[in-house]
């Protein structure tokens, strides 16, 4: 050996990723696990960003459709304060109350129809006070508009039943179908909304 030369050392080993064991074999399972962990992070910058953008676009479209649905529902439910936009929760509550009021009206109408069909005199069928959306006052409901005065659908005898479709309020009702007359009676029932 030369006195001034140092023995040559082995070439430096490739750097080992942080967090991996100090094994230097490239085929070691530990090194493979570390390299697999790094790959998805680099893949997200390319294909992952597009997937995130598509997901965000789908969510924006979903929210847009939900908002359009609420906008359409607001147009169909009655609300007292027309000057302010109902919140989503208020819209849903108003829709529930509106549906319940319609169900009560249909139940009352069916009871009157059944009583008239059976030849029985309808008993004073009065629905419970209709509850409208918050802030509105209930309106008295009576789709049959029973009265003792003679009219197109009634008789001159006091207390005799009248047709649920008759009304003395309008002179053009004779040209309307029964469904249209029922809607007119219903709209007068909702007059306060």
Swiss-Prot record:
Subunit structure of this chain's protein: Efficient DNA binding requires dimerization with another basic helix-loop-helix (bHLH) protein. Forms heterodimers with bHLH transcription factor TCF3. May not heterodimerise with bHLH protein HAND1.
Miscellaneous remark of the record: In contrast to the mouse ortholog, the ASCL2 locus is not imprinted in human placenta.
Cellular component per GO, a single term: cytoplasm
Cellular compartment(s): Nucleus
Region (Disordered): 1-27, 37-56, 118-177
Annotated bHLH domain residues: 50-102
Tissue: Expressed in the placenta at a stage between the first and second trimesters and when it matures, at about 32-36 weeks. Expressed in the extravillous trophoblasts, the intermediate trophoblasts, and at lower levels in the cytotrophoblasts and stroma of chorionic villi of the developing placenta. Expressed in follicular T-helper (Tfh) cells.
Record CDD domains: bHLH_TS_ASCL2_Mash2
PROSITE patterns on file: BHLH
Biological process, per Gene Ontology: chorionic trophoblast cell development; negative regulation of Schwann cell proliferation; negative regulation of T-helper 1 cell differentiation; negative regulation of T-helper 17 cell differentiation; negative regulation of T-helper 2 cell differentiation; negative regulation of transcription by RNA polymerase II; neuron differentiation; placenta development
Protein name (record): Achaete-scute homolog 2
A Pfam family recorded for this sequence: HLH
InterPro entries the record matches: bHLH_dom (IPR011598), HLH_DNA-bd_sf (IPR036638), MASH1/Ascl1a-like (IPR015660)
Keywords: Developmental protein, Differentiation, DNA-binding, Neurogenesis, Nucleus
Keyword Metal-binding on entry: no
GO molecular function: bHLH transcription factor binding; DNA-binding transcription activator activity, RNA polymerase II-specific; DNA-binding transcription factor activity, RNA polymerase II-specific; DNA-binding transcription repressor activity, RNA polymerase II-specific; E-box binding; protein dimerization activity; RNA polymerase II cis-regulatory region sequence-specific DNA binding; RNA polymerase II transcription regulatory region sequence-specific DNA binding
Regions of compositional bias (Low complexity) in chain numbering: 140-150
Alphabetical list of SUPFAM superfamilies matching this protein: HLH, helix-loop-helix DNA-binding domain
Purpose: Transcription factor. Binds to E-box motifs 5'-CANNTG-3' in the regulatory elements of target genes, probably as a heterodimer with another basic helix-loop-helix (bHLH) protein such as the transcription factor TCF3. May bind both open and closed chromatin, acting as a pioneer transcription factor to allow other factors to bind and activate lineage-specific genes. Required during post-implantation development for the generation of some differentiated trophoblast cell types.
